[in-house]
Structures are given as structure tokens and as C-alpha cells.
Amino acid sequence: MQRLALAGTRAIVDMSYARHFLDFQGSAIPSKMQKLVVTRLSPNFREAVTLRRDCPVPLPGDGDLLVRNRFVGVNASDINYSAGRYDPSVKTPFDAGFEGVGEVVALGLSASAAFMVGQAVAYMAPGSFAEYTVVPARVAIPVPGLKPEYLTLLVSGTTAYISLKELGGLSEGKKVLVTAAAGGTGQFAVQLAKKAKCHVIGTCSSAEKSAFLKSVGCDRPINYNTEHVGTVLRQEYPQGVDVVYESVGGAMFDLAVDALATRGRLIVIGFVSGYQTPTGLSPVKAGTLPAKLLKKSASVQGFFLNHYLPEFRGAMDHLLKMYAGGELVCEVDTGGLSAEGRFTGLESVFRAVDYMYMRKNTGKIVVELPPSVNSKL
């Protein structure tokens, strides 16, 4: 048997270890796979990313899992990643995608102390837009099965949970405004604020999304295509809102600042309206911002999930328990209502990104990869 992994500096050649590197029913893991690779830095996902069909399947190291992906998540920030905005020194090519849910099909010796072949896991790690991804065991989270709902909790759910817990100061009776409230992370911000007994206002773009927001407890959905957000906030909430969960940027950010109550808090988790521009930014009225904040003793604070990774696992555990107990709706959008049908296969990731930026999705956009005939899950 060929060398499969290293345990420290020792090559593992024990034949009894071979079972960790075999798929179910004894069929070998294929030598080649498909994956999405960023080959050019650009916020235009279609221009930046290439589907490569003949890539070697990687082997896991001593502390790693090899995961056959079943569901992968699409995030607004995928185009920031493809543009190289998170690391100005990054060089192409590099693998795309942040998160996945799949099945462990191989693992290193150290990783086998906590995981086994055939186990379902969720993970947040680079390179998820692939048929197989090597995932460090330390970041993998066991889940009860291969369900897309578990994927919604990774980036989207934990962003809402940690940011509101650490920065929101939620308490009974507070008024909370959630922008893009029917999206992947907005849906969780709405529900978590309601769990804290807050009054929740949510912006969205359609009657269907308004209905969804009502179904998860939103007190006042605002369809900005039929109502002016600023007018509604001034007329119905003259004292302002206490907390804003903001992901849109631009004019929506300006409206949210104007709507803050005395000692209000605005949490910026993104500014998606600017991501497709060359700079990645959306214009805001920054010149008047200090005066507005001073006048109300208000604050604006950013939240980037990577800066809160020590809180990630605890947040996932809490959200998984909520979902298992029927306390949390995890809305999944697999493109069933899109013109070309469901998002199935890696080639559909391109359509899924377009779909998101056309503001079509309700809930988290998830791409399904074909199941293996050998899977037990």
C-alpha cells in the first residue's frame, strides 16, 4: 500500500489503516473530481471562477477529514472572496466556497479519534465548491444527517447569533430593524430578536418575502418596492429603533442611521449593495455620520465572523439545539422557482450567485451536489 498520510514524521503504511481511505462497499474514492477555482481576481463571479473537471482528489493529512460534499452554501461575500478583498496578497488560482455539509469518506489517524467514515459533518472552511474537500477535524461539526438546514446555520446563522449576542444588547421590548430580513442571515436575526421578546421590523423586496417574514414572527415587514422605508420608520417609529442588523449598505445604511433611537446600536454585517462594484463599497453619507451619532449617543459597529471564531462552535451548538427542538426555522432556497430550475451540481453555483444578486432568494441559497450511490446517509 502506498503512503497515505503522515503522523508527525512517521509514514503510515499499516494495511489495517487502509479502511480509513476506502469508500463504502469497498469502492475506492475516485482519483479525479470537479471543483470551482478562482483563476482571475474579479467581483464578477462568472469572470473570476472556472469549473475544473479533472482535478485530483486530495488526501487528508493526519488531523484532517476528506468530506464528500452534499450541500454547499452560497454567500453574498463569495464575490468579495473571488475579488481577493479579504487578502490583498492572495494569488490565483485558489479554491472557492466557504461552507458545506457532507459525509466523511476518509480521515487521518489523529482525526479518527473523534470522527469516523460515514459520519455527516458541517464545516466552514475554504474550498467547499468541490465534490470533495479536505477539512481540518478541529473545525468540523458533527450533524445528525445530510440536511441543507444544517448548512444554513454555519455562516448565516452564527453571524446573526454571535453579533446580536455580543453587540446587540437585546432585551424585552426593544425595537429591532433587520435589513434584507428574508435573506440567508436576516431570517435568523428576525427569529433571534423575537426570542429575546423584541419588536422586529424587517425590510424585504416582495409580497412573498413579507409573508415569509410574518410566518417567522416579524412584527412589521416593509416591502421597499411598495413602501418607502424611511417614511414608514418616521411615521410608525418616531422614537427610533434600538438596534439595527444591517447588511445592505448605501441608501439603506443611511436610512438606518437616521432611524436610530437615542443610544441606538447599528451592527454592520455587510454592505451587499456595493459588492459588485470595482471598490466593493456602496456610497454612504459619511460626512454627517459623526454628528448624527453624537446627537443620539448612538453607535455603529462592524461584525466580521472570522474575528469571533472562538465563539463559533458554541453558537453552532446552540443553534443546532434550537433547530432540533423546533424553535428555529431554517429556510432553504435551492432555486426551485428560478427560471432554469433547482441548483444542482457545481455548474449551478454560477446561477445561484446571479439569483442572489437579483434579490430572488428567500432564506439561504443552497446548491445540492449529486449523492453517492455508496453513501449510507
Swiss-Prot record:
Binding of NADP(+), residues: T185, S205, K209, Y224, S247, I269, Y275, F303, F304, L305, N361
Catalytic activity: 13,14-dihydro-15-oxo-prostaglandin E2 + NADP(+) = 15-oxoprostaglandin E2 + NADPH + H(+); 13,14-dihydro-15-oxo-prostaglandin E1 + NADP(+) = 15-oxoprostaglandin E1 + NADPH + H(+); 13,14-dihydro-15-oxo-PGF2alpha + NADP(+) = 15-oxoprostaglandin F2alpha + NADPH + H(+); 13,14-dihydro-15-oxo-prostaglandin F1alpha + NADP(+) = 15-oxoprostaglandin F1alpha + NADPH + H(+)
Example of a GO biological process term: negative regulation of fat cell differentiation
An example molecular function term from Gene Ontology annotations: 15-oxoprostaglandin 13-oxidase [NAD(P)+] activity
Modified residues (N6-acetyllysine): K35
CDD domains (alphabetical): Mgc45594_like (cd08250)
Subcellular location field: Peroxisome
Group of enzyme by EC: oxidoreductase
Residues modified to Phosphoserine: S299
Major localization class: other
Cellular component terms (Gene Ontology): peroxisome
InterPro entries listed in its UniProt record: ADH-like_C (IPR013149), ADH-like_N (IPR013154), GroES-like_sf (IPR011032), NAD(P)-bd_dom_sf (IPR036291), PKS_ER (IPR020843), Quin_OxRdtase/zeta-crystal_CS (IPR002364), Zn-ADH-like_protein (IPR051397)
Pfam families the record matches: ADH_N (PF08240), ADH_zinc_N (PF00107)
Entry EC number(s): 1.3.1.48
Keyword Magnesium: no
Record's keyword terms, sorted: Acetylation, Lipid metabolism, NADP, Oxidoreductase, Peroxisome, Phosphoprotein
Family: Belongs to the zinc-containing alcohol dehydrogenase family. Quinone oxidoreductase subfamily.
Function: Functions as 15-oxo-prostaglandin 13-reductase and acts on 15-keto-PGE1, 15-keto-PGE2, 15-keto-PGE1-alpha and 15-keto-PGE2-alpha with highest efficiency towards 15-keto-PGE2-alpha. Overexpression represses transcriptional activity of PPARG and inhibits adipocyte differentiation.
UniProt protein name: Prostaglandin reductase-3
Provenance organism: Bos taurus (Bovine)
Gene: PTGR3
